[in-house]
Amino acid sequence: MMKRAFLFIALCCLLLAPASFPQQKKIKIIADQDSAGPQGTNFLSLLMLLRAKQVDLLGITTISGDQWVEPATVFALWATEITGRTDVPVIKGAQMPLLHTQREQELQEKIYGSYVDWHGSFNPDAPAPSETWPPPGGYPKVKARPGRAADFIIDTIRANPGEVILYCAGPLTNIALAVRMDPGIVALTKGIYIMGGSSNGGPELNWWWDPEAAAMVLREPWKEIVVSPFEAGAQVVSSERLMKEVVAAGGPLAAHVRQQYLESPPLAGTTNWSMMWDELLVASIIDPTVIKKSERMYLDVDVEHGSKYGYTVVWKPDGVPQFFLPYSGPRAPDQEKWRSHLAPPAQMHEARVQMEVDVSKFEKIFVNLMSD
C-alpha cells in the first residue's frame, strides 16, 4: 500500500512539474542586402531579421543594387538602432558589379531597347555613389565595422562550419567575391537563400545588375540552393491594411511603420506600397510552410553581352510537355528522351524555386515579427 502511495505522489509531482523542452536552436544567418530605406522591401526584410527570435543574425553585409552601397550602409546601421540590435555588425560591401557598368547598360539600351523598368543604382537620375542622406531623426550613431564584406562572409562561415545560411536579397557581388577568394566556404555553408531571377526566364534587377556574379554563385555546388524569384514575391504586396495591422499589434516598430507608411505621403511619382520580395524570403527561412509549392529547376544567367544580358536561364528537368495531339504518331512521348533533352549542363546545380505562396500565413508571420 505504501509503495502504491509513493508511486501516486511521484506521478503527481511529474505531472505538476513545469514541462522541460530542449530549446530550439536559432538559425544562423548572414544577411547580404542592398538595404534601401526607410521604406520598401529591402528595409522591412532587415527589420524582420533583426526582430526574429528564431534568428541568430551574425552580420549584415551591404551591397549596391536598388541603392548605392554608401546609403545602403547608412540605412542598415539605422535598422540596427531602431530595433535595438546594434550588437549586429554591419560591413560595407562592393560598390560596383564585377563587369557590368552603367555606361555599357546605356549603350545596350540604345541598341536593343530598354527591357528593365527599374535600374536601381543605374537609374539615369540616381544620386552619385558617394551621396548619402540622413534617415528620419538623423544619421545613426553606430558605425560600420571596418573591413570588407567578402572577408566577413568567409571568416564567419569558417567560424561556424555547416551552420550558416546566406540570405541574399541583393545583387550577388559580395558572395561571388567571397567564393572566388575562398572556394572552400561553399561546402561549409548550410544553404544559400536567394531573392532573384525569374522562374520564366526573364530579367530581374538583382541578377541583371551583376550578371557575372549571379552566374558564379549559381554554378557553385552549395548544399542547398533556394531561390525566391520575382514571380513569388509578386504574390504578396504591402498595403495600408497590412501596415495598420502592424500598428494595431503594437511593439517597438509600430511608430516607425505608422510614420513611414500611414502618415507620410509618397513623393511625386512614387508609392508607399510595393511587392514584398525580400520579406517573403525571410519568412520562408523562418517557416518553410509559407511556400505552398516549389519546383526543381536549374538556373543560370546570360552573361553574353547581347540583347538578353542578365536574363535568367531556366532548365526544368521535370517539365516534359504534355501533348494534346499525337503528332509523333501512334505512340506516347518518350519520357526518358525528353528528360535527357531537358537536362542542364553539367556545371549547373539543382535549386528549389518558390512558386506558390500561402499569402495569409505570410501576412501573419510578417505582422508577428514586426510587432513582437
Regions found by a protein language model. Give the residues of each.
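Boundary at the C-terminal end of the N-terminal hydrophobic targeting segment
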Residues: P18, P22-Q24
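Active-site histidine-anchored catalytic micro-motif
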Residues: Q24-T86, N123-R241
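Surface-exposed loop and adjacent secondary-structure segments within mature catalytic domains
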Residues: V88-P140
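Bacterial N-terminal signal peptides
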Residues: F8-A17
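Bacterial N-terminal signal peptides that target proteins for export
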Residues: M1-I9
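Short, mixed-charge aromatic SLiMs
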Residues: Q67-V74, L98-L99, S198-G202, D300-V320
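Conformational coupling and interaction surfaces
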Residues: K25-I27, L47-A52, D56, W208, ...
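Short, surface-exposed amphipathic charged segments that create phosphate/polyanion-binding patches used
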Residues: E104-G113, E204-W209, L242
